[in-house]
Design a protein with these regions (language model features):
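Membrane-proximal, proline-rich intrinsically disordered regions
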Residues: 20-69, 309, 322-324, 397, ...
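Bacterial Sec-dependent N-terminal signal peptides
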Residues: 3, 10-40, 200, 232, ...
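Hydrophobic-face positions in mid-chain alpha helices that act as interaction patches
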Residues: 44, 243-375, 409, 422
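Conserved, well-structured interaction surfaces
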Residues: 82-157, 191, 208-213, 363-370, ...
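Short, surface-exposed recognition loops and adjoining beta-strand edges that mediate ligand/DNA contacts
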Residues: 32-33, 61-76, 127-130, 157-172, ...
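TPR-repeat structural position
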Residues: 197, 241, 392-393
């Protein structure tokens, strides 16, 4: 009997030890409640947040929307790559669409985690003045990134914003807390488009308050100028044309970002991702650190001349929008090349994304650092906003002419008005 009790006691002790081991936190993991206890922790999570953005702003997140706009024509043997988007047959079960949806919400989750961590640290009262400003900057950046990604989701999955109907149209789920779950019953409702944009504007207001880093050309991080650029784009989308014009004009007038006019420098700038007019460029460091790619438009597995095998080529009407002799954008974006298809000959290809040589070792992987905002967009936002305000056609023309004068050699300013002006801005 004594032996039996001894065995039972020993077994109980083993079960107790096993139970304790099961309850121990894995040595290779971090408790989310204790993940951000210092400025260094916040910086590490901030770096991780930015690292994810190289996927959110490249590849399918960019070109699937282009394929839906009739800018490109699929070659005969394109293998149905991107076919559902090209043929307007995207359904809720389309893997690429769901990947974009879940991908962006994953990055929003990362932003929410950083926001919560910085708020906790700021409320702790343990930071000195310098560290407080640093953590506030990180907080503002995370608020900005959440707003940016929510806006992108609304562009992909919602109708165009109309102030008259935004309160009755579907938006996207607004998620502001880090609470990952596989329980779909806990997922928030889509809500209205108005609610979605209210959160976007609120986050941008927070970013404007706490992001104090000055803008620099090709900044890898969110700066005050990045926030202003997004405010301009959001305001234009919301039909708040006065704000859109004001924000765009602020960046133009700052003189920090110069429009490029040299054809060689402009073309090389797209190849090497060093355009001097870029407000925000997501950093990539080399062949082992890049985002999604753009292989559909060239796709050459050997790197040898004549072996280009594109799935899509630009439509003729797109090429005709450019002054092919004098516009510096034409040779940077397009090139007539021999191709390896079901015929032998030359075709004008879209070569805006040939691959940055620093991001591959032998044959191009067609990877590039995303240039999220450029000053050229601010000129177009200013022009369209001025046109829509009414009575400011001359102002709109000025911004359009200023942009074209830098892009087209020998360009002479034009005096457009009305619908003709609107069409010229959009083209």
């Amino acid at each position: 009997m004594k032996r039996i009790l001894t065995i039972i006691s020993a077994a109980a002790a083993l079960l107790s030890v096993a139970s304790c081991n099961l309850e121990k936190f894995p040595s290779t993991a971090i408790n989310s409640e204790e993940a951000m206890e210092s400025v260094a922790d916040c910086k590490a999570f901030r770096n991780g947040l930015y690292s994810g953005l190289k996927y959110a702003f490249t590849g399918a997140y960019v070109y699937y929307t282009d394929l839906q706009t009739d800018l490109f024509h699929a070659v005969k043997n394109f293998g149905n790559w991107g076919g559902p988007f090209y043929s307007y047959n995207v359904t809720a079960s389309e893997d690429a669409a769901t990947s974009i949806w879940f991908g962006l919400y994953g990055y929003i989750g990362n932003a929410n985690f950083l926001i919560a961590g910085t708020e906790k640290l700021l409320a702790s009262g343990t930071l000195d003045e310098a560290d407080t400003k640093t953590v506030q900057q990180y907080y503002g950046e995370a608020c900005y990134i959440r707003a940016h990604l929510l806006f992108n989701l609304s562009q992909y999955f919602c109708e165009d914003y109309d102030p008259e109907t935004a309160g009755t149209k579907f938006g996207v789920p607004v998620v502001t807390k880090y609470a990952p779950t596989a329980d779909s019953d806990k997922y928030p409702h889509r809500g209205t488009l108005e609610t979605t944009y209210e959160q976007i504007v609120k986050d941008l207001d927070e970013a404007e308050k706490y992001v104090t880093a000055a803008g620099t050309v090709n900044s890898a991080y969110v700066t005050k100028d990045v926030v202003t650029a997004r405010q301009a784009r959001v305001a234009l989308t919301m039909h708040d044309y006065e704000t859109a014009l004001l924000k765009a004009k602020t960046l133009i007038d700052s003189g920090t970002y110069k429009l490029m006019s040299d054809a060689t420098a402009y073309a090389k700038g797209w190849v090497n991702d060093n355009l001097t007019e870029t407000i925000w460029r997501i950093a990539m460091t080399g062949p082992d650190d890049y985002g999604n790619t753009y292989g559909y438009f060239i796709y050459n597995t050997t790197g040898e001349e004549g072996n280009d095998d594109p799935q899509y080529i630009p439509e003729d009407w797109v090429l005709d929008l450019y002054d092919q002799e004098n516009d510096i954008r034409y040779d940077a974006y397009f090139d007539e090349r021999e191709v390896s298809l079901r015929f032998t000959g030359t075709v004008t290809l879209f070569v805006k994304y040939p691959g940055n040589p620093t991001l591959y070792s032998k044959v191009s992987n067609y990877a590039h650092m995303p240039k999220v905002f450029r000053i050229s967009e601010m000129y177009l936002i200013a022009a369209e906003a001025a046109y829509n305000i009414g009575g400011q056609d001359a102002v709109a023309c000025k911004y359009l002419n200023d942009l074209r004068a830098k892009r087209i050699a020998g360009y002479e300013a034009q005096n457009y008005n009305g619908t003709a002006l609107r069409n010229e801005i959009r083209d």
